[in-house]
UniProtKB/Swiss-Prot annotation:
PANTHER family according to UniProt: LARGE RIBOSOMAL SUBUNIT PROTEIN BL19M, RIBOSOMAL PROTEIN L19
Protein name: Large ribosomal subunit protein bL19
Highest taxon in the source lineage: Bacteria
Purpose of the protein: This protein is located at the 30S-50S ribosomal subunit interface and may play a role in the structure and function of the aminoacyl-tRNA binding site.
Record bears the keyword Coiled coil: no
GO biological process, any: translation
Amino acid sequence: MNLIESINAAQLRTDIPDFRPGDTVRVHAKVVEGTRERIQIFEGVVIARKNSGINETYTVRKISNGVGVERIFPVHTPRVEKIEVIRHGKVRRAKLYYLRALTGKKARIAERRR
């Protein structure tokens, strides 16, 4: 292992649950406001996972007051306290960008049987 790989391996988190696109997750993100730090919960559907290793990110989409909101989180960031998987969705795509154009019942994702 070269120097860069060893530095990256030291920063990888091991407490990340197994989740895929289509899963509904609850992300507990640390938010700094002035001198205070608090936990903000962002719950939505994972619509994409990109890259690998230390650079891996995932996109979570939710509907807030009738408006679609998406946030991109790095998987291995210390700014995310924990990730809870609420339900596992059954999808046949790796990227669910088509959900942006769907509303109401059309945007629902069936639950995957375990």
